[in-house]
Amino acid sequence: MIVKICGLKKAVDVQAAVENGADMIGFVFAKSKRQVTIEQAHELAKNIPTNIKKVGVFVNPTEEELTAAIKGVPLDIVQLHGQEPTSQAERTDAEVIKAFPVKEGKLPDNISDYKNAYILLDAPAEEYEGGSGKTFDWDKINSDVLLKNKLIIAGGLNAENVQEAIHRFEPYGVDISSGVETNGEKDPEKIEIFIKTAKGVE
């Protein structure tokens, strides 16, 4: 099971993710309380082994913003959380995760247009895209129409519910941010417990 820890801002949190077996580490460049600059992400990325993929999270970025981050950090994957056209995803010089908010149990009509991207299902956004700490309605989703080897589940995951999510969706990976925080800050102990719990599912 691929595990992505998202919204990291401190070296100690990156270290906790690395030491406990995270497969992807996410840096948020979109406006949010977890936002980092390219320079900050570059410094944090120095402590990430090459076998762990570095992901940049964006909302409706320009081509220039994407290119600057991909080269400056550098990034292996870009995660697009806005209304980005498929053409932008196809032109990007990195792998792509396209995030879709699941509203009222419905998958977006254009989800199949992103043929080469990983598909991330998340709860509907509130103040900003992602990191809301809320789950979408798992019972209403027919994940059979999605490619399991491209599917990533996010939205309100934590150590208590991640095993159920994995059994239900059989995804390629799971993505967490607020579920490994205490009082709005990343918690190394929660990072450790979540990764071990997610990877312990048979």
Swiss-Prot record:
Pathway given in the UniProt record: Amino-acid biosynthesis; L-tryptophan biosynthesis; L-tryptophan from chorismate: step 3/5
Keywords, sorted A to Z: Amino-acid biosynthesis, Aromatic amino acid biosynthesis, Isomerase, Tryptophan biosynthesis
GO biological process: L-tryptophan biosynthetic process
Reaction catalysis annotation: N-(5-phospho-beta-D-ribosyl)anthranilate = 1-(2-carboxyphenylamino)-1-deoxy-D-ribulose 5-phosphate
Keyword check for Transmembrane: no
MF GO annotations: phosphoribosylanthranilate isomerase activity
EC numbers: 5.3.1.24
Entry similarity comment: Belongs to the TrpF family.
Name listed for the protein in its UniProt record: N-(5'-phosphoribosyl)anthranilate isomerase
Organism field: Listeria welshimeri serovar 6b (strain ATCC 35897 / DSM 20650 / CCUG 15529 / CIP 8149 / NCTC 11857 / SLCC 5334 / V8)
